[in-house]
Amino acid sequence: MLERLHEQGFADLDAAHLTVFQYPGPQGARPSDLAVQLRISRQALNYLLGQLERLGYLERRADTDDRRSKRIALTHRGELVVRVIREAVAELETTWSRQLGPKRFAELRTLLLELNQHA
C-alpha cells in the first residue's frame, strides 16, 4: 500500500500515517473517538494528526456541536490518499476473490472482520 501511495505522489507518508486512514477514515471524527477506534493512545494519535496536518492531508477544525472539541477534516490531498487506498484495496479483494472463489473469499473476509473485532 505504501509503495503504491509513494508511486502516486504521496512519498511523504509513512506506515504510521496509514493507521489514520483506515476504514472508515478520519473524516469528521473527533480525535478522541478515532484513537479508541484505532486502538492507539490519544497522544500517539495527536502526534500523527500533527504530522498529517503539517503535510497538508488534514485539518483539525472546531466541532460545531462543541466548540471545546475538534473534528478532523480531510483536505483535498487527504481525500486523494483515501481514494488511492480504496482503489488498491478493491483491486486486492478482486484478486483474492478470483483466486479463492467468491464463497471462500466471503468466508475469509468474515473471519478477518471477526478477528479484528476481538483484537
PLM feature segments, named:
Residues L80-A119:
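Terminal interaction helix/tail motif
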Residues A16-V20, K70, R104:
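Short, conserved alpha-helical segments within structured domains
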Residues F10-A16, T75, L100-P102:
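Short helix-coil-helix linker/hinge
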Residues M1-S41:
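N-terminal helix-turn-helix DNA-binding core of bacterial DNA-binding proteins
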Residues Y23, L74, V81:
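Conserved SAM-binding loop
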